[in-house]
Amino acid sequence: MYICRNHPLAKQKSISFEQLQKYPCLSFDQGDNVSFYFSEEILSTNEYPRIIRTNDRATMLNLMVGLNGYTLCSGIICEELNGDDYVAVPYEDANNPNSTMEIGYITRKDNTLSKMGTLYVQELNDYLQQESKKMQQR
């Protein structure tokens, strides 16, 4: 889950659903015709006491800072692009067993990725390994 660096829960090793109840959940709205299977957030069908939907990433990032909001998204918040005002904290919740998200890509059967596609996937894997190490050091 992503929150701003100054959020009261930012230094936690992990965060549960109960700990988030008093903060607004920020959801990225991709429109009415998008299946929840393609949602960028885990637990997108949960009921939240306070939820703000936006279709603009800059607005979402500003609301994280201004309102101590959070998002349970799969999006990568890249420090080089967005600054270091945001942190990822593991979301762990025994009451929500579907709180992990698998991210992948789809290719046509019997096709291989292009050189550019292979490079892109490798860069993503490298980035995720770096971020995983950062989270383990917390």
Kindly give the residue locations of the regions a language model identified:
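Short beta-strand-to-loop elements that line the ligand-binding cleft
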Residues: 27-28, 46-59
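Non-transmembrane alpha-helical segments in soluble domains
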Residues: 61-64, 121, 125
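Beta-alpha-beta core module
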Residues: 58-109
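Secondary-structure junction motif
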Residues: 17, 23-46, 75, 113-121, ...
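Hydrophobic/proline-rich hinge and linker segments of small-molecule sensing/allosteric domains
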Residues: 1-30, 99-110, 125-129
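Short glycine-/acidic-enriched loop or helix-start segments at secondary-structure transitions
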Residues: 12, 37-38, 81-83, 117
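A residue-level structural signature of the nucleotidyltransferase/glycosyltransferase Rossmann-like core
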Residues: 18, 52, 69-70
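A conserved hydrophobic position in a structured secondary element of the catalytic/binding core
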Residues: 4, 55, 73
